[in-house]
UniProtKB/Swiss-Prot annotation:
<comment type="subunit">
    <text>Homodimer (isoform 4). Interacts with CXCR4.</text>
</comment>
<feature type="glycosylation site" description="N-linked (GlcNAc...) asparagine">
    <location>
        <position position="104"/>
    </location>
</feature>
<feature type="glycosylation site" description="N-linked (GlcNAc...) asparagine">
    <location>
        <position position="72"/>
    </location>
</feature>
<keyword id="KW-1010">Non-syndromic deafness</keyword>
<dbReference type="GO" id="GO:0005764">
    <property type="term" value="C:lysosome"/>
</dbReference>
<feature type="glycosylation site" description="N-linked (GlcNAc...) asparagine">
    <location>
        <position position="41"/>
    </location>
</feature>
<protein>
    <recommendedName>
        <fullName>Sialomucin core protein 24</fullName>
    </recommendedName>
</protein>
<keyword id="KW-0967">Endosome</keyword>
<feature type="topological domain" description="Extracellular">
    <location>
        <begin position="24"/>
        <end position="162"/>
    </location>
</feature>
<feature type="glycosylation site" description="N-linked (GlcNAc...) asparagine">
    <location>
        <position position="146"/>
    </location>
</feature>
<dbReference type="InterPro" id="IPR007947">
    <property type="entry name" value="CD164_MGC24"/>
</dbReference>
<keyword id="KW-0732">Signal</keyword>
<keyword id="KW-0964">Secreted</keyword>
<keyword id="KW-1133">Transmembrane helix</keyword>
<keyword id="KW-0812">Transmembrane</keyword>
<feature type="glycosylation site" description="N-linked (GlcNAc...) asparagine">
    <location>
        <position position="77"/>
    </location>
</feature>
<keyword id="KW-1003">Cell membrane</keyword>
Length: 197
C-alpha cells in the first residue's frame, strides 16, 4: 500500500470516528407527557379521648372556594390546606380536622390527565411519566393519630428514538464512504499513468 493510500485511509477513519461522536451529541428531545396515578386513601381507627380545638381560618384561606385556588402561591405567607369531609370540602389554614382528608398540594385536587397529540411529521412515540413531585395525604381523627403517606417519585427518562436522525446518519456515513472510495480510485488511476523510464 502506498503512502498516499495509508494517509487517505487514516483520514477516512478519523472522519468516521468524528461523525459517530458528533451524532451522539445531536439528539432531540420531545416534550414529556405526565399522567397522575390515583393514590389510595389512608384511614385510621377513631380515637375519642381528647376534644378537638379548632382555630378560625384567616380570610385568605376562607375566601377560596376551589381546590386549585386553595394552593395559590401568589399570596405571600399563606399556608392553606384543602379539606375534604363526607359532606363538604373547603379551604382552611388549619390542618387538624377530625374525620376528614387534608391535602397540601395541587396534586391532591382531581385533575383530568392530558392526552398526547403527535405532530404530523413525528415518528417518535410520546413518553408517559409520573409526576416528579410527591403528594402527601393526611387523615386525622379526633385525638392523637396522624398517618402520612408519601409516594416516591421515579427517575425521569429522556431517551427517545428519532427515525429521521437515524436515516440522516446513515446517509451521511454512506456519502462520506462514497467520497473516500472515489478519492482512492482517483489516486490509484494517477499512479498507473506514470511509467518509469
Amino acid at each position: 500500500m502506498s503512502r498516499l493510500s495509508r494517509s487517505l485511509l487514516w483520514a477516512a477513519t478519523c472522519l468516521g470516528v468524528l461523525c459517530v461522536l458528533s451524532a451522539d451529541k445531536n439528539t432531540t428531545q420531545h416534550p414529556n407527557v405526565t399522567t397522575l396515578a390515583p393514590i389510595s386513601n389512608v384511614t385510621s381507627a377513631p380515637v375519642t379521648s381528647l376534644p378537638l380545638v379548632t382555630t378560625p381560618a384567616p380570610e385568605t384561606c376562607e375566601g377560596r372556594n376551589s381546590c386549585v385556588s386553595c394552593f395559590n402561591v401568589s399570596v405571600v405567607n399563606t399556608t392553606c390546606f384543602w379539606i375534604e369531609c363526607k359532606d363538604e370540602s373547603y379551604c382552611s389554614h388549619n390542618s387538624t380536622v377530625s374525620d376528614c382528608q387534608v391535602g397540601n398540594t395541587t396534586d391532591f385536587c382531581s385533575v383530568s390527565t392530558a392526552t398526547p397529540v403527535p405532530t404530523a411529521n413525528s415518528t417518535a412515540k410520546p413518553t408517559v411519566q409520573p409526576s416528579p413531585s410527591t403528594t402527601s395525604k393526611t387523615v386525622t381523627t379526633s385525638g392523637t393519630t396522624n398517618n402520612t403517606v408519601t409516594p416516591t417519585s421515579q427517575p425521569v427518562r429522556k431517551s427517545t428514538f428519532d427515525a429521521a436522525s437515524f436515516i440522516g446518519g446513515i446517509v451521511l456515513v454512506l456519502g462520506v464512504q462514497a467520497v473516500i472510495f472515489f478519492l482512492y480510485k482517483f489516486c490509484k488511476s494517477k499512479e498507473r499513468n506514470y511509467h518509469t523510464l
